From Swiss-Prot:
Belongs to the bacterial ribosomal protein bL33 family. GO terms for molecular function: structural constituent of ribosome. Signal peptide: none annotated. The gene is rpmG. The keyword Repressor does not apply. Keywords: Ribonucleoprotein, Ribosomal protein. GO terms for cellular component: cytosolic large ribosomal subunit. This is Large ribosomal subunit protein bL33. InterPro entries: Ribosomal_bL33, Ribosomal_bL33_sf, Ribosomal_zn-bd. GO terms for biological process: translation.
Length: 55
């Protein structure tokens, strides 16, 4: 069987609230770390989320 192209990653809030989203990423086309600006309900505002490994 072939290796899966998409992998699951954790997007952790840079506001240090501990909140995170789980997202999928194509490991072949997106080789660099993913960053997205999304809503953090703990901080109650839009902040940048950075990629981290799911343990």
């Amino acid at each position: 069987m072939a290796k899966a192209v998409t992998i699951k990653i954790k997007l952790v809030s840079t506001a240090d609230t501990g909140f995170y989203y789980v997202a999928k990423k194509n490991s072949r086309t997106m080789t660099d770390k993913m960053t997205k600006k999304k809503y953090d309900p703990v901080a109650r505002k839009h902040v940048e989320f950075k990629e981290a490994k799911i343990k």
